[in-house]
């Protein structure tokens, strides 16, 4: 007689996978995590699966309008999902899980357009194919529901940050330094959690390193460390109206891309490449620090996640910029709170899948500007 499998204490408790490929477009981060109501999430495995240069080129090309987009987009989505499936299989192998033990996969997809002011955001994905390749339920398309409610569809991580990183009596900021920088302000007392995109981070830093070093990123910030911040160039970059726009706001490669940078560099032909890199690093730090100074002046601690957490030159620049802005905050990575920085974004999308399964809201309207909190995502059954 077959034995009944033990049921979770809460009907949606269990093991979820989270997959995130961000605006740096270098690969996909994945986590396998156990969620139980009233308990901290437990990470069972993590994995990173890189993208081949051919896939990266296809993704970068889709950032800008071009010919035959529908065909190119569909083929790129299938190639992308093939890498997602590899990541899922690696998580399953590392954690020693059968597919029946996995409640669902929460997958963000790859943003190729983000234009909430026009009523849409587009994440490249083929969740039906991922469900077929993994034989696990897939939950995807998290951002569009928030946009449909009048929100920016971003950032979505603040609700997760509040659950995991908040501390009573202490104002904290969680700063994600991915392709784009964003912050979550955790008030530590009565008050709304807030969050928004600050501006470019690795999107421009990596692009400049690729152009001048032939490498996908500035390893440890060494290229920037060879240069000197050019105050006049930094001022010209900071003249971009986005930096002074009030929240809620979100941005991406639609605005902050190499063409945006080149248009401003045209007035500074004498600036050496390493000085441009130093200035781009300062741009990231200053744009974040100014937003913290304006919206969380009492912040005592900033915790960094994302790829920028591995760049000590950028972290030092952020510390300097915060001091200059009059913010007496320490800067550390989320590892100090028990979550390695490379796991945070993927964890957030596993959590969003968990919330969807419980039919609980995943956004914060105070962050995105939506008409209200909404259940985010769509289910693709295995």
Curated annotation (Swiss-Prot):
Keyword Transferase tagged: yes
Ranges in a coiled coil: none
Binding locations of ATP: 22-29
InterPro entries with a match to the protein in the record: Anhydro_N_Ac-Mur_kinase (IPR005338), ATPase_NBD (IPR043129)
Biochemical pathway: Amino-sugar metabolism; 1,6-anhydro-N-acetylmuramate degradation; Cell wall biogenesis; peptidoglycan recycling
Reactions listed under catalytic activity: 1,6-anhydro-N-acetyl-beta-muramate + ATP + H2O = N-acetyl-D-muramate 6-phosphate + ADP + H(+)
GO BP, sorted A to Z: 1,6-anhydro-N-acetyl-beta-muramic acid catabolic process; amino sugar metabolic process; peptidoglycan turnover
CDD domains found in the cross-reference section: ASKHA_NBD_ANMK
EC numbers, comma separated: 2.7.1.170
Keywords recorded for this protein, A-Z: ATP-binding, Carbohydrate metabolism, Kinase, Nucleotide-binding, Transferase
A single MF term (Gene Ontology): ATP binding
Assigned protein family: Belongs to the anhydro-N-acetylmuramic acid kinase family.
Function recorded in the entry: Catalyzes the specific phosphorylation of 1,6-anhydro-N-acetylmuramic acid (anhMurNAc) with the simultaneous cleavage of the 1,6-anhydro ring, generating MurNAc-6-P. Is required for the utilization of anhMurNAc either imported from the medium or derived from its own cell wall murein, and thus plays a role in cell wall recycling.
Protein name, per record: Anhydro-N-acetylmuramic acid kinase
């Amino acid at each position: 007689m077959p034995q009944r499998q033990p049921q979770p204490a809460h009907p949606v408790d269990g093991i979820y996978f989270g997959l995130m490929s961000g605006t740096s477009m270098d690969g996909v981060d994945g986590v396998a995590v156990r969620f139980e109501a009233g308990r901290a999430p437990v990470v069972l495995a993590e994995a990173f699966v890189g993208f081949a240069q051919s896939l990266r080129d296809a993704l970068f090309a889709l950032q800008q309008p071009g010919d035959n987009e529908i065909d190119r987009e569909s083929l790129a989505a299938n190639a992308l999902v093939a890498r997602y499936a590899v990541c899922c299989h690696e998580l399953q192998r590392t954690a020693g899980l059968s597919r029946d033990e996995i409640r669902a996969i929460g997958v963000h997809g790859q943003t190729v357009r983000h234009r909430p002011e026009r009523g849409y955001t587009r994440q490249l994905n083929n969740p039906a194919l991922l469900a077929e390749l993994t034989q696990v339920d897939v939950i995807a398309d998290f951002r569009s529901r928030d946009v449909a409610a009048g929100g920016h569809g971003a950032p979505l991580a603040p609700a997760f940050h509040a659950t995991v990183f908040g501390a009573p009596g202490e104002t904290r900021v969680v700063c994600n330094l991915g392709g784009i920088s964003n912050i979550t302000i955790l008030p530590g007392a009565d008050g709304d959690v807030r969050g928004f995109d600050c501006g470019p981070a690795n999107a421009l830093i990596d692009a400049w390193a690729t152009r001048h070093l032939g490498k996908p990123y500035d390893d440890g910030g060494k290229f920037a460390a060879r240069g000197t911040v050019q105050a006049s160039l930094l001022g010209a970059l900071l003249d971009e109206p986005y930096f002074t726009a009030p929240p809620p706001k979100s941005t991406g490669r639609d605005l902050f891309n190499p063409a945006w940078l080149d248009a401003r560099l045209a007035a500074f032909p004498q600036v050496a490449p390493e000085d441009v890199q130093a200035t781009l690093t300062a741009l990231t730090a200053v744009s974040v620090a100014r937003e913290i100074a304006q919206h969380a002046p009492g912040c005592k601690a900033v915790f960094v996640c994302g790829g920028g957490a591995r760049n000590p030159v950028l972290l030092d620049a952020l510390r300097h910029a915060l001091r200059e802005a009059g913010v007496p905050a320490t800067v550390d990575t989320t590892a100090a709170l028990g979550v390695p920085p490379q796991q945070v974004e993927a964890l957030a999308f596993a959590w969003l899948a968990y919330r969807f399964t419980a039919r609980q809201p995943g956004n914060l309207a105070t962050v995105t500007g939506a008409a209200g909190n909404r259940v985010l995502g769509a289910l693709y059954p295995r």
